[in-house]
UniProtKB/Swiss-Prot annotation:
Keywords: Cytoplasm, DNA-binding, Transcription, Transcription regulation
InterPro entries noted in UniProt: Integrase-like_N (IPR017856), TACO1_YebC-like_2nd/3rd_dom (IPR048300), TACO1_YebC_N (IPR049083), Transcrip_reg_TACO1-like (IPR002876), Transcrip_reg_TACO1-like_dom3 (IPR026564), YebC-like (IPR029072)
Pfam short name (any one): Transcrip_reg
Transmembrane parts of this sequence: none
Locations listed in the record: Cytoplasm
Homology family: Belongs to the TACO1 family.
Species of origin: Acholeplasma laidlawii (strain PG-8A)
The protein's name in its UniProt record: Probable transcriptional regulatory protein ACL_0044
Primary location class: cytoplasm
Alphabetical GO biological process terms: regulation of DNA-templated transcription
Superkingdom of the organism of origin: Bacteria
Any one annotated GO CC term: cytosol
Length: 239
């Protein structure tokens, strides 16, 4: 299952995604989490998790507070979580997760990018079944110590990998909050953490022109304001 974060990191690294995009994305997530529950992260676990992730991305305290205050103020602004599935160059598989206040705009923007890459959007489930949906944590800690802590706290993991002092934990998405709490309670900090889609099989695109089309497609998707995350099954040569 390896290198869960590498595919996503490689994709994001090829974009010129400004901090403003990260701020905007987390601003929406914080606002929606605060609006869906209480605006207090101590009593709203979903809000607490989003804030923790936002801080790791250097989202400022002002942006966090501003979006919580907006939710407190009873703003009628609303966002829907939408997922699209599609096929890129050479049959590559792509999942796009969006948070949008205008689904017509979002689907139009996403479809245009797929059309430019000579790809196509699929129906719901056409791509999803070829990915595992997992909570993933990368933790810099001794393997035996970390596994012992997880076992003692009845954390149910589905798999793990250890390489050069970093342990990658895989679990069902429902275990995300529990794992985060256990790590924090034991003074362990994750280098990376996310609920993500991991391809069951990866592929390489051999043709340079097709690879360029794929890169432009992923870059374009990541640059859309409504797009929260992009997952795919392509690895570059040499990875």
């Amino acid at each position: 299952m390896g290198r869960a974060f590498e595919v996503r990191k490689a994709s994001m690294a090829k974009t010129a995604a400004a901090k403003s995009k990260v701020y905007s994305r987390y601003g929406r997530e914080i606002y929606m989490a605060a609006k869906a529950g209480t605006p207090d992260p101590e009593t709203n676990q979903a809000l607490k998790r989003v804030i923790e992730r936002a801080k790791k991305e250097q989202v400022t305290a002002d942006i966090i507070k501003r979006n919580i205050d907006k939710a407190k103020g009873g703003s009628d602004e609303n966002y829907a979580e939408i997922r699209y599935e599609g096929f890129g160059p050479e049959g590559s598989l792509i999942i796009i997760e969006c948070l949008t206040d205008n689904t017509n705009r979002t689907i139009s923007d996403v479809r245009k990018l797929f059309n430019k890459a000579y790809g196509k959007l699929g129906v719901s489930g056409s791509v999803l079944h070829q990915f595992d949906h997992k909570a993933v944590f990368e933790v810099e800690a001794p393997e035996n110590k970390l596994l012992e802590i997880l076992l003692e706290n009845d954390v149910d993991i589905t798999d793990y990998e250890a390489e050069e002092g970093v342990v990658t934990i895989y679990a069902e998405p429902t275990e995300y909050g529990k794992i985060a709490d256990v790590l924090k309670d034991n003074n362990l900090e994750s280098k990376e953490e996310a609920i993500m889609f991991i391809p069951m099989q990866t592929m390489e695109i051999k043709d340079p022109e097709e690879q360029a089309k794929f890169d432009r497609l992923i870059e374009g998707l990541n640059e859309l304001d409504d797009v929260k995350d992009v997952f795919h099954n392509v690895i570059s040569s040499g990875e």
